[in-house]
């Protein structure tokens, strides 16, 4: 192979269709657009989604909002105020809260929220803490551990 004998692949260089150059050319007169109708007029084609004047599908269906998060993480939530009734020095986990009856069903990992007051020192192990809950547990002399 040399530069002087390079050639394009067969069928790679397709000729442009010359329309409106007489009937013998094959694309004369109506230029392949047929006889009459909207598709043969100038300014064609119609815009995408046009249904001939009928109310289009994208306007017939309602505007949907508030799609749920696909991979949303659900937590079993407990407020700090609910932990105030436990004895000082208690190890708080999801299992221990279910045993005591503070949590009735397991909805996922434990998350501690900051509503309520806490005066006893507790050792809390949970998957997540709000900033307020963390401050209240540590202010009461307790400790937190992320699981």
From Swiss-Prot:
> Biological process (GO) annotations?
translation
Q: Where is the composition biased (Gly residues)?
A: 23-35
Q: Which UniProt keywords apply?
A: Ribonucleoprotein, Ribosomal protein, RNA-binding, rRNA-binding
**Which GO terms of the molecular function aspect are on file?**
rRNA binding; structural constituent of ribosome
Q: Which InterPro entries match?
A: Ribosomal_uL15 (IPR030878), Ribosomal_uL15/eL18 (IPR021131), Ribosomal_uL15/eL18_sf (IPR036227), Ribosomal_uL15_bac-type (IPR005749), Ribosomal_uL15_CS (IPR001196)
Q: Where is this region: Disordered?
A: 1-55
**One cellular component term from this protein's GO annotations in UniProt:** cytosolic large ribosomal subunit
Cross-referenced Gene3D superfamilies, in alphabetical order? 3.100.10.10
PANTHER family given in the database record? 50S RIBOSOMAL PROTEIN L15, LARGE RIBOSOMAL SUBUNIT PROTEIN UL15M
Protein purpose: Binds to the 23S rRNA.
User: What does the subunit comment say?
Assistant: Part of the 50S ribosomal subunit.
Please report which protein family the annotation says this sequence is part of: Belongs to the universal ribosomal protein uL15 family.
This protein is called: Large ribosomal subunit protein uL15
Organism from which the protein derives:
Synechococcus elongatus (strain ATCC 33912 / PCC 7942 / FACHB-805)
From the broadest rank down, the organism's phylogenetic lineage runs: Bacteria, Bacillati, Cyanobacteriota, Cyanophyceae, Synechococcales
